[in-house]
Structures are given as C-alpha cells and as structure tokens.
C-alpha cells in the first residue's frame, strides 16, 4: 500500500469534487428560486413587491457569477493533475466538460452573457430552463465523478 502522486490526485479530487457538487446544488436551488420568482403573478401587481423581487433576482445572479470561475478553475485543475499523473482514462472523462467550460467562457458576449448570469438574460424563460438543465447535468457528472474518484483512489492505494 504505497502513496503515489495518482493517489494524491484522486484524494484531492474527491475533496474538490464535493465542493463542485455543492456548487451544482446551489445552482439548482438558485435557478428554482428564480423560476418561482418569475412565475409569481401576485407580486407583479404591487410595486413594492416588484422592487423587492428585482433585488432578490439581482442578488441571486450576483452570487451565481461568483461561483463560475471557481468551478471552471477547479475542473481545470483536475485535468492538469490527471495529465501530470498520467491517468489517461480519468483525463479523457473530464476533457469534454473542460472543453464545454472553455467554450462557455470564451463564447460569451462582453456586455451581457449567460456566463455572467445577468438578470435580464437569466429571467428569459428559455435561458432559465437551459441553465437549470445544465446545472442538473453538471450535478450528475460531478456525482458520478465523485464515486469514480473514490473507486480509483482505493484501487490506486491497494494496487501499488
């Protein structure tokens, strides 16, 4: 039972993947709250409630913006670690999401983007639905990755 760099990579990935799972859950909850605010017809008649609702939407979008770069950075770190550890299968499983993150980051308009989660853009029903589906897909990916990393960590520790 030897401690290798690959085992260290899997251990660190487990901890960071747990953080990514919480990020994905937070995204799902935030988008669900935005969807609920979007469909509340009673509050639209009262200007006081409308201002409060708008502040709530801006607050949620601001918090969502704060989670984008850490998520992309952590996932990029996974790929760099597995590349250095020569864990090719694990790297191959992570590269599609890494490419999606790069595409999402570099193909967003400068003034208003889905990546930045601007309130007018996010409150579009199609964009909100897309973002919510994306969050569910990322949650599924991170959950599967978590258990894969756990298995690989145990296998690496036992086999070496």
Curated annotation (Swiss-Prot):
Positions on the Lumenal side per record topology: 32-72, 160
Tissue expression summary: Expression is up-regulated in dorsolateral prefrontal cortex of patients with schizophrenia (postmortem brain study).
Keywords: Cell membrane, Membrane, Postsynaptic cell membrane, Synapse, Transmembrane, Transmembrane helix
Annotated InterPro entries: Cornichon (IPR003377), Cornichon_conserved (IPR033466)
Main location: membrane
Keyword Cell membrane found: yes
Coiled-coil ranges per UniProt: none
SMART domains on file: Cornichon
Molecular function GO terms recorded: channel regulator activity; signaling receptor binding
PROSITE patterns registered for this protein in UniProt: CORNICHON (PS01340)
Membrane-spanning ranges: 11-31, 73-93, 139-159
BP GO annotations: neurotransmitter receptor localization to postsynaptic specialization membrane; regulation of AMPA receptor activity; regulation of membrane potential; synaptic transmission, glutamatergic; vesicle-mediated transport
GO terms under cellular component: AMPA glutamate receptor complex; dendrite; dendritic shaft; endoplasmic reticulum membrane; endoplasmic reticulum-Golgi intermediate compartment membrane; ER to Golgi transport vesicle membrane; glutamatergic synapse; postsynaptic membrane
Location of the protein in the cell: Postsynaptic cell membrane
Cytoplasmic side: 1-10, 94-138
Topology within the bilayer: Multi-pass membrane protein
Keyword presence, Membrane: yes
Function (record text): Regulates the trafficking and gating properties of AMPA-selective glutamate receptors (AMPARs). Promotes their targeting to the cell membrane and synapses and modulates their gating properties by regulating their rates of activation, deactivation and desensitization.
Description of how the protein assembles with itself and partners: Acts as an auxiliary subunit for AMPA-selective glutamate receptors (AMPARs). Found in a complex with GRIA1, GRIA2, GRIA3, GRIA4, CNIH2, CACNG2, CACNG3, CACNG4, CACNG5, CACNG7 and CACNG8.
Family, as annotated: Belongs to the cornichon family.
Protein name: Protein cornichon homolog 3
Source taxonomy: Eukaryota, Metazoa, Chordata, Craniata, Vertebrata
This protein's encoding gene: CNIH3
């Amino acid at each position: 039972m030897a401690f290798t760099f690959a085992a260290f990579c899997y251990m660190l990935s487990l901890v960071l993947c747990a953080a990514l799972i919480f990020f994905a859950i937070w995204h799902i909850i935030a988008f669900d709250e935005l969807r609920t605010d979007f469909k509340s017809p009673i509050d639209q008649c009262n200007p006081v409630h409308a201002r409060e609702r708008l502040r709530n939407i801006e607050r949620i979008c601001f918090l969502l913006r704060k989670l984008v770069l850490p998520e992309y950075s952590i996932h990029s770190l996974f790929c760099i670690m597995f590349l250095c550890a020569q864990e090719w299968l694990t790297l191959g499983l992570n590269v599609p999401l890494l490419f999606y993150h790069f595409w999402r980051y570099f193909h967003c308009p400068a003034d208003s983007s889905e990546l930045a989660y601007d309130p007018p853009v996010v409150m579009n029903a199609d964009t909100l639905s897309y973002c919510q589906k994306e969050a569910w897909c990322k949650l599924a990916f991170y959950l599967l990755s978590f258990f894969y990393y756990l298995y690989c960590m145990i296998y690496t520790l036992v086999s070496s």
